[in-house]
A protein has these predicted regions:
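Membrane-interacting alpha-helical segments
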Residues: 1-5
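Acidic/histidine-rich alpha-helical segments that form the ligand environment
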Residues: 6-13, 17, 21-24, 76-116
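Generic detector of leucine side chains in alpha-helical contexts
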Residues: 19, 31-33, 52-54, 65, ...
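Inter-helical turn/loop segments and adjacent helix faces that build the functional surface
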Residues: 26-36
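Conserved alpha-helical segments that form or flank metal/cofactor-binding pockets of metalloenzymes
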Residues: 34-81
Length: 116
């Protein structure tokens, strides 16, 4: 792989991370789990800062812009949730959501570790 392909792949993964953390923060806000939401907001901002540093590094060292690949991450929020309000959420839904979201996040972080 060329340096351009490597940087592009990493940046694409970072964009996906930003979207994942944003969706998780929204989901946890919906579930009334503010601490989890704040954590994922923070992770989203950290991911964004890292991506900006990567872009800056690539531009200052290689004097090129990073070509943006098209990607579509898997949705975090289940489609069925859009017909409910946060008042409809019960303890069982929160428990299952925390378990599912944490598993997805851990898997994504494992993919990130493998990629880097």
């Amino acid at each position: 792989m060329t340096i351009e392909e490597i940087i592009n792949k990493i940046e694409t993964h970072m964009w996906e991370g930003i979207l994942i953390h944003n969706a998780m923060a929204e989901t946890y806000d919906f579930l009334g789990l503010r601490g989890y939401a704040r954590f994922h907001h923070y992770q989203m901002y950290e991911e964004m800062c890292s991506m900006m540093h990567l872009s800056h590094y690539y531009f200052t060292h290689y004097h090129k812009l990073i070509k943006k690949d098209e990607f579509m991450p898997q949705p975090i929020i289940p489609d069925s949730w859009y017909k409910y309000t946060s008042m409809d959420v019960d303890a069982s839904t929160k428990r299952n959501a925390i378990k599912d979201l944490t598993e997805r996040w851990i898997n994504w972080e494992r993919e990130t570790k493998t990629l880097y």
